[in-house]
Design a protein with these regions (language model features):
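Transmembrane helix boundary and interhelical junction motifs in multipass membrane proteins
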Residues: 25-34, 173-182
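Juxtamembrane transmembrane-helix boundary motif
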Residues: 1-21, 35-50, 71-167, 221-271
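Hydrophobic alpha-helical transmembrane segments of multi-pass integral membrane proteins
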Residues: 190, 194-214, 224-226
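Generic transmembrane alpha-helix signature in multi-pass membrane proteins
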Residues: 34, 66-73, 180-185, 210-220
Length: 271
């Protein structure tokens, strides 16, 4: 990490700030941080910097998660956390094995990320198709209006298994599971603050559980922890400042922004 320049440090701090804002209520923005960290570390360390960026980012994620859970501590819906968590952890173990298998084979890791991006965009398209059909039925049956938002959609348990497993692999390979969990929680129809609080608590637990796996892979070292430690301040600052912006965004704009970043993240995984 001695090869990091002032420009590298500035970009890493900017990425940490953006990640904090993502955790604090500006959904999807953290996907930009994943790209920033990977590009900066690749420039500083060469090809080995790409996998190292995953380990460098994890403590920063956890610091932002801690700040976000403090802000939204009363808004988490543990029913959905407990539904997603087991499969997220199972997917994390699978991702650990895959990461270990593909270390030194970046082309094959890229192919797996492409597959995740295709699945993510496919699920997004499916959601919009279902929403269009639901709206059509609501127009035909006015008395049914509003009923669909009161209870979780049918098959939500099965969706939790699918989304959790995919998310676990994605978070281990690239710290890129945010859109997967956000897609699931959005389909469940959670209100804005419950959405953010549930997501924050879920990823705090999952990210802490990832620590021993990343140490085993050699992508978290004492040197990387020192660098990550300096990035805690911008990350936590972003998480604390984000709610001030969230309060000024209505639910429709909020959800539109989520979908935009989910689609953007899907294309980023593919290309």
């Amino acid at each position: 990490m001695d090869t990091l320049t002032h420009t590298h440090w500035f970009l890493l701090a900017l990425g940490a700030l953006i990640m904090g804002m993502s955790k604090g209520g500006i959904p999807g923005a953290g996907n930009l941080t994943v790209a920033i960290f990977a590009l900066v570390l690749e420039d500083a360390l060469g090809p080995v910097g790409v996998p190292m960026s995953v380990g460098l980012l994890l403590p920063v994620l956890i610091s932002a998660d801690v700040a976000a859970t403090g802000v939204y501590r009363r808004h988490a819906d543990w029913k959905y956390i407990l539904r997603l968590l087991p499969c997220f952890l199972l997917g994390t173990v699978l991702g650990w094995w895959v990461f270990d298998y593909f270390q030194g084979g970046n082309d094959r890791v890229s192919q797996l990320k492409t597959l995740i991006g295709v699945i993510l965009l496919s699920m997004t398209a499916l959601h919009f198709i279902l929403q269009a059909r639901k709206k059509k039925k609501a127009d035909e049956l006015p008395s049914a209006e509003g009923s669909s938002t009161q209870n979780p959609p049918k098959g939500s348990m099965g969706l939790g298994i699918v989304f959790g497993s995919i998310g676990g692999v994605a978070t281990m390979l690239a710290n890129a599971a945010g859109p997967v969990a956000q897609l699931y929680l959005l389909v469940m129809g959670l209100p804005k603050y419950v959405f953010i609080g549930t997501s924050a608590w879920l990823f705090l637990i999952v990210n802490v559980c990832k620590i021993p796996f990343m140490i085993d892979l050699g992508i978290i070292t004492w040197e990387s922890i020192v660098v990550s430690g300096w990035l805690f301040i911008p990350a936590m600052s972003g998480a604390v400042l984000a709610p001030m912006i969230v309060k000024r965004i209505n639910q429709q704009i909020f959800e539109t922004m989520i979908w935009f970043f989910i689609i953007l993240a899907g294309f980023r995984m593919i290309f």
